[in-house]
Amino acid sequence: MATIGRRAYAEMYGPTVGDRVRLADTELVIEVEADYTLRAGGYGEEVKFGGGKVIRDGMGQSQRPNGPGPHDAVDCVVTNALILDHWGIVKADIGLRGQRIAAIGKAGNPDVQPGIDIVIGPGTEVIAGEGLIVTAGGIDCHIHFICPQQIEEALSSGVTTMLGGGTGPATGTFATTCTPGPENIANMLRAADAFPMNLGFFGKGNASRPEALRQQVEAGVIGLKLHEDWGTTPAAIDCCLSVADEGDVQVAIHSDTLNESGFVEDTIGATKGRTLCAFHTEGAGGGHAPDILRVVGEANFLPSSTNPTMPYTVNTLDEHVDMLMVCHHLDAAIAEDLAFAESRIRRETIAAEDILHDLGAISMFSSDSQAMGRVGEVVLRCWQTAHKMKVQRGKLPGDPERHDNGRAKRYVAKYTINPAIAHGVSHEVGSIEVGKWADLVFWRPAFFGVKPSLVMKGGFIASALMGDANASIPTPQPVHYRPMFGAFGGALTRGSLSFVSQAALASEVGSVYGLRKPLSAVKQCRTVKKGDMVHNAYLPRMEVDAQTYQVRADGQLLTCEPATALPMTQRYFLF
């Protein structure tokens, strides 16, 4: 039997079992754990498109028409992709049917090839995945919807689902992720029809009586946001959680930095063990000062942090005071406002935040877009943090010297499956699994986490790097991100979801509001616990010294040095 060298094989068909791939210019290396394209019986039955290649009539392409069944041809096939997801790092072909993932396995022509579970036919489009890493579309669960231009920026970074609140550049939206009231909720859902992005909105949860909160759930919010700027008192926390339990929606909390209405113990007590997403479980983003990190040790708090402090660098502290003053409508001329800002920014807790992510104690990663966070840097900063932690802390337990698969799965889960589980949308998005919405992001390994090559929404290309449209080929430089056909017309509204509450779906708000996007209801928001956070369920006993701000997890002091240089930076960007 003819053979081919490993390097030549990888260059032609992509890496296979045992091959390793470096992620961008980081110190992170992943290794292929399994190769589903070998189901035909081994090497030699790979499919590839192009002149003189396999996917031709009667060869790798069958005569079968497209259809809904497993023996029918799929609408699109991604060949020889390297999938990086929370469940594994595998080589596979991916079959897409309609807006969903139909199969992950071996593609080809079952009439002439053995072991085929993805049928290629005359009606099948091909995307060459050889040499590319494919991840699930990212989920940013902390969005201030301040301007619609955020959505294009996020999509170009590999984010395909944005959850948050706001109504545009209103003063309330600058500071809080709330879309308050039925009229504003309806208008934001109407606006969502214009964007190739899955969108869901939080209502305002700050109330001591339930009527106005129920009204927002019925109008279509996927959750309620408690924010200190509206008054996150124990009474408001209790009321909000009670309404959320009735409607099976999530609660997100930004707790009381000033400790005016209670301390962290009072907030924990007010929850009575009920689940909520703890936004700003971090070193400088807000919440009870200085010990909000204590909620990392509570089973009913689903912790996330935002990207401006991640990872901790020599520049982190300098930018934060001014940034905070702007975002929270503070005045540097007022001593109390300045003291408020400075109380939130603590180098010791910022340093601990990096380590808590690496330990899997902080479960999710988000942006806090234009409100002390950068909407296009969720994926980027997540992997920069993983790199920094490997350099400073070494290998994670369970990872051998050869690769960092365990760390890679932990970090990819922070912006994919875990926010999906926490917010009740994991039945639709958050991972590359059969039956889920086909939101896929394609990366050249050298640009992984920095600049995706292609972004698919609902099985159709919505954004891609593209050169001069008047050129004779599609690749002349300079290239930049441009919306593709999946971002226009009916393809846009078929390819993306608007998430709403179960009550809103039952009352047919889509018809009432005149919506065109398909609606999907969030579910199982109230039963999820920290233990359900994939690869990020560590529940340490937390201590934060109120005088020194030192942080300990299970007695271990958490401290690290700020980075003086990072990968995924000036090598890739002019500005």
UniProtKB/Swiss-Prot annotation:
Ni(2+) 1 binds at H142, H144, K225, D368. Its EC number is 3.5.1.5. Its cofactor is Ni cation. Keywords: Cytoplasm, Hydrolase, Metal-binding, Nickel. Its main location: cytoplasm. It catalyses: urea + 2 H2O + H(+) = hydrogencarbonate + 2 NH4(+). GO terms for cellular component: cytoplasm. It is an enzyme of class 3 (hydrolase). Carboxylation allows a single lysine to coordinate two nickel ions. This is Urease subunit alpha. It comes from Methylibium petroleiphilum (strain ATCC BAA-1232 / LMG 22953 / PM1). The lineage of its organism: Bacteria, Pseudomonadati, Pseudomonadota, Betaproteobacteria, Burkholderiales. The gene is ureC.
